[in-house]
Amino acid sequence: MPKKNPASTAIDSKLLKALCEIQAPSGHEITMKNFLLKYIAKEKKNWKHRPQLIVGDLLQNCILLKFGKPRTAIFAHMDTVGFTVRYSNQLVAIGSPDAETGTTLIGKDSLGEIECTLEYDHEHHAFYKFGRGLDRGTPLTYQVNFRETPTFIESPYLDNRLGVYNALKVAETLKDGVIAFSCWEEHGGGSVGYLAEYMFKKWQVRQALISDITWVTDGVEHGKGVVISLRDRNLPRREFVEKIISIATKRKIEHQLEVEGLGSSDGGELQRSHLPFDWCFVGAPEANAHTPHEKVHKADIISMTLLYEVLMKEL
């Protein structure tokens, strides 16, 4: 018998911690891809419906899971922010990391494991401090310190390992839909266009939910429910967003409405594509975005997964 999906009532902290600990910044998603493929191979026997797994050179490091007769896709990006080793002891950003001097960075090059310290000069250029020089191009990420209380989870890379976690939890009971694990979101995107074209041509899918993490702000609070974004730098089609709000309200799922002028997501790539996709960002809010101290309320994680389960049935 398939196991009952626990996502609506509990947090699988072990899985979320494992996801956060995987070093896979933008451009280096292969480690996350390999983890997900092993996880899917092991767990799919417990899912209510078996998906078709689609991977290969034409999708680069992305993964598609197709369930039944899909109408809606979930996009969850696998990558994180980080740094790339430049020359001497210089670092250049991957995406927009926001870490203080003294932050521990980890990685691996041809000489072995790395655990170095982040430093900045007076012009805020980033450098590493280590006992030897590092290979050019080596990716470095925050050392993960996963902290959990009865109310909160705090860790580097909840953006977007929590979005990936959410997609995996929805997969446990999903009957009809597509889950797309995408690449490069933190560094400008680049994979969503061909993923969207594939599912549009293959299955006529043209609705998308963006399983990602947004910000706690003056209008979005911890513990008040999953965020439905009315807009960020991009503007989704209002009719589609209102349909999502209506479903959340009818089902009495706690939610918040977000209005921002900055920030973007995989939804921005969908909006700029030539395909007639409707999309909406639906995700839990976090404090301390892109720092080693990202913090999310557990109730918001639960409401996020609960809303996704309902939306994938009713959209």
Predicted segments, located by residue:
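N-terminal hydrophobic/helix-forming segments and targeting peptides
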Residues: 1-315
